[in-house]
C-alpha cells in the first residue's frame, strides 16, 4: 500500500448518477483530447531529434509515463497541459463554472500526483524537467537548451 506524504485527494467518478451531467458535444470534445503525442510533445521531440539526441517516448514502465526519457542520462521530461496540471491554479479554479465538484478535485489530484512523481525521480537520482505546453509552443529553443544543459552536466 502506498504511503502519501499528504492526504490523497479523492476524485468522484464522473457519471450521471453522481450529479455530473455532460452534453453530447462536450463528450465528443473530451474524447478528442490526446493523452500522448500532443502537438507540444511532437514539437519538442522533433527539435530534440534534430539536435542528434535520441530518447524514448512515453516509457510505460517508469512512474508517470514520462513524455520523453533519456535512460542513459537518467533524465525524464514531462510536458504538462496547463489546464490538466493546474497552471495558475488559484486563479483558474475560480473560472470553472460547471461540474466544479468533479473538476476541482480532479485537477488537484493531478497536481498532487505530479508532486509525488517529482519526489520519486529526485529520490532515485534522476533529473526531471517539466515544461508547460505553452512554454514549448512559445519558447521551443529555450526548452531544447534546458534539456541539452541537463544532459551536459550528467557525469
Which positions does each model-derived feature cover?
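Nucleic-acid endo/exonuclease domains
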Residues: 1-130, 134-155
Amino acid at each position: 500500500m502506498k504511503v502519501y506524504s499528504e492526504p490523497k485527494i479523492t476524485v468522484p467518478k464522473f457519471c450521471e448518477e453522481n450529479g455530473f451531467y455532460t452534453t453530447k458535444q462536450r463528450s465528443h470534445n473530451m474524447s478528442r483530447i490526446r493523452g500522448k503525442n500532443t502537438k507540444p510533445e511532437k514539437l519538442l521531440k522533433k527539435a530534440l531529434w534534430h539536435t542528434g539526441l535520441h530518447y524514448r517516448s512515453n516509457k510505460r514502465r517508469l512512474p508517470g509515463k514520462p513524455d520523453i526519457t533519456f535512460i542513459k542520462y537518467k533524465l525524464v521530461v514531462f510536458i504538462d497541459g496547463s489546464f490538466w496540471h493546474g497552471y495558475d491554479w488559484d486563479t483558474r479554479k475560480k473560472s470553472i463554472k460547471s461540474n466544479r465538484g468533479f473538476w476541482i478535485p480532479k485537477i488537484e489530484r493531478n497536481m498532487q500526483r505530479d508532486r509525488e512523481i517529482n519526489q520519486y525521480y529526485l529520490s532515485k537520482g534522476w533529473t526531471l524537467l517539466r515544461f508547460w505546453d505553452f512554454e514549448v509552443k512559445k519558447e521551443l529553443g529555450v526548452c531544447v537548451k534546458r534539456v541539452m544543459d541537463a544532459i551536459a552536466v550528467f557525469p
